[in-house]
Amino acid sequence: YYFMCGINGFNFKDIALIHDMSKITSSRGPDNEDYFSSENYTVGHNRLAILDPDKRSNQPFIYKNLILSFNGEIYNYLELKKILIEKGYKFLTTSDTEVIIKLFHLEGIESFKRLSGIFSISVYDKSSEKLYLIRDTIGVKPLYYHYNSFSKKFIFSSLIRGILISLDSKRLNYDAVHSYSNFNRNDCRETFYKEVFKVLPGELIQVQNGDFKRKNFLDLKLKKNYNEINIKADISTYFGKQFLSDVPVALSLS
């Protein structure tokens, strides 16, 4: 059972650790596993290929000084690709991956506001040594992180278990457990483990020189005064975009 790609990374160099983390997230992507590493950044990716299954779209995806690793789908990538082509960008793949990184190259973090889809994205800028993490407004695609204020080490992963293997102490967060047991959900930043946190839906995290900051960046835009015809038309449009794929598609209802 595959969940669409896994991403792992941290702001230091440790090849053994990225391999161990990638093994933990391997169930999320059977089609390719790879990593990028420098002295100040390491990132790995487990790929479940949906668009452009060719190896040219494997991740981490590098364009100039940018390194991208993401999990998800961008439903409006063809429209965005057209805009980029008009700006003079050329494309070597037919994936949404290349669209994300080149749009970021053009517009920086403002590019995230153009994306329609479900995603957890990591972008690293080698020139500024700055890491960006962002998650879609609904929070469909998971992304977790750990930050040690003493060592300045920052670690992120699609799975909590991917982070736990790097921690010396694994302590339960009883407040989060209590919240879940009472309400059958946990919408807070905290997870079941202390010192492991969620990137919240729509949140942007920036890490540079061992320091990180976070802010709400993407807002869920709700339209008022909708009539039944408009709702049906929008549902039909969005469903159509979600069926874009270069591999067989199935629909399961439960």
Residue ranges of predicted features:
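Cysteine-centered catalytic environments shared across enzyme families
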Residues: 3-254
